[in-house]
């Protein structure tokens, strides 16, 4: 399967399966060149711009987190996003390993308004 990353900031919303990656990749370099920190609120997405921010909402619980996209993946056909350990923990996905989520890109300016 081929993915073509978005080259501009545009609205994006999708529902699909999230997974998480943790200890095995902790300390490894991400696609952005940053070092992966399983305790940071980050995620890997196949097409969202690096860097960008997304709100990820677990459809079952309604819990939401905001993550910074700093890596590419997941490269498993049925997966939409790979969350850091801590993001998955906050969404309640650690024990099951995966779960259905909605991913919405946060456009520039919106994040600023949230944290004023």
Annotate the PLM regions.
Residues 1-116:
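Secreted/periplasmic proteins
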């Amino acid at each position: 399967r081929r993915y073509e990353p978005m080259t501009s900031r545009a609205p994006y919303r999708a529902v699909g399966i999230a997974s998480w990656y943790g200890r095995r990749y902790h300390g490894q370099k991400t696609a952005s060149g940053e070092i992966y920190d399983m305790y940071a609120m980050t995620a890997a997405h196949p097409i969202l711009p690096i860097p960008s921010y997304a709100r990820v909402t677990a459809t079952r619980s309604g819990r939401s987190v905001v993550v910074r996209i700093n890596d590419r993946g997941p490269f498993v056909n049925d997966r939409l996003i790979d969350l850091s350990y801590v993001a998955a923990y906050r969404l309640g996905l650690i024990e099951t390993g995966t779960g259905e989520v909605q991913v919405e890109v946060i456009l520039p300016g919106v994040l600023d308004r949230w944290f004023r």
